[in-house]
A protein has these predicted regions:
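N-terminal Rossmann/SDR dinucleotide-binding element
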Residues: 1-69
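NAD(P)H-binding glycine-rich loop region in Rossmannoid oxidoreductase-like domains
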Residues: 56-92
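Short alpha-helix in the Rossmann-fold core of NAD(P)-dependent oxidoreductases
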Residues: 75, 85, 92-97, 113-116, ...
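Short-chain dehydrogenase/reductase
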Residues: 90, 138-146, 180-181, 207-208
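Conserved Rossmann-fold NAD(P)-dependent oxidoreductase catalytic core, especially the SDR/UDP-sugar
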Residues: 98-140
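Conserved beta-loop-beta element that borders a ligand/cofactor-binding pocket
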Residues: 116-117, 149-174, 184
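Active-site Tyr-X1-5-Lys
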Residues: 123, 138-163, 191-192
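C-terminal substrate-binding subdomain of Rossmann-fold SDR/epimerase-dehydratase oxidoreductases
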Residues: 194, 199-262
Length: 262
């Protein structure tokens, strides 16, 4: 399968590309290149057939010719960034994605994997959130996820199959590291300062999922029979990896010798 991965130079994208290539897929990347410098460790980006330097809002039908599937990761990627400039978040994350999908349909791309988020559930009243739970997005980032799911679902037809993966909070190493994610952030503090200072009571829950497990979920979605994934939503995570923030902090502090938790 020939796959276009948008946001390929990001935290998830660079790992996903390697996973897909290892499974025999032909991968082409697309990225703005804003964060091209500052790799945490070396990786062989030269293995890409090509990496297109482009904003998704400017992508053309010509650029999209010849792909079997698109995995869309290229968005403004967290709540604080989304709240800083909500209009830009909507322009890129919502309208940029819808425009991209319209062009995908025009050129005959049959599969589109959209990386949504568990943040669409907001503060849930139920003990656990399932794919059938009603979304209650609290931020511009989460609201855009819900809008994209709604609009893309309406575009599904016999020739176009979108799939929505609501990922839990990612953790784990990547050449393009993110330290704004809760577990990664606490591990960075433990390593660099030897101390984790709790700034709240730590009672909020965080569903976690390893970044490579997200990659595997995406790969399995691409390879699954069409009737299984057509216009479906899947939570990507494991109930056993739901933790309160204070529990995550305790585990991290115990993992790094000499780290103090205050």
């Amino acid at each position: 399968m020939k796959v276009l991965v948008t946001g390929v130079e990001g935290y998830l994208g660079v790992l996903l590309a390697a996973v897909l290539m290892e499974r025999g897929h032909e991968v082409v990347g697309l990225d703005t290149g804003f964060y091209r410098d500052g790799w945490l460790y070396n990786t062989d980006m030269a293995r890409f057939v090509s990496c297109i330097n482009m904003d998704i809002r400017h992508i053309t039908e010509e650029t999209l010719q010849g792909y079997d599937a698109v995995v869309h990761l290229a968005e403004l990627s967290n709540d604080p960034l989304g709240q800083l400039r909500p209009k830009i978040t909507y322009d890129i994350n919502h309208m940029g994605t819808v425009t991209l999908v319209n062009k995908c349909k025009l050129v005959g791309i049959e599969r589109f994997v959209y990386t949504s988020s568990c943040s669409v559930y907001g503060v849930g009243a139920e003990s656990y959130q399932t794919e059938a739970s009603a979304p209650h997005p609290q931020t511009a980032y989460a609201k855009c996820k819900v809008l994209v799911e709604r609009d893309l679902a309406a575009m599904a037809d016999d020739d176009f199959s979108p799939t929505f993966l609501r990922n839990a909070t990612a953790y784990g190493p990547s050449p393009r590291m993110r330290f704004d994610l809760v577990l990664n952030n606490l591990a960075a503090l433990a390593w660099t300062t030897g101390e984790i200072k709790m700034t709240s009571d730590g009672t909020p829950w965080r569903p976690l999922v390893h970044v490579l497990d997200i990659c595997e979920a995406i790969a399995c979605t691409l390879e699954a029979p069409r009737e299984v994934i057509h216009n479906e939503i899947f939570n990507v995570g494991d109930t056993r990896e739901n933790y309160q923030v204070k529990e995550i902090a305790q585990i991290v502090a115990e993992t790094f010798p000499g780290c103090q938790l205050t």
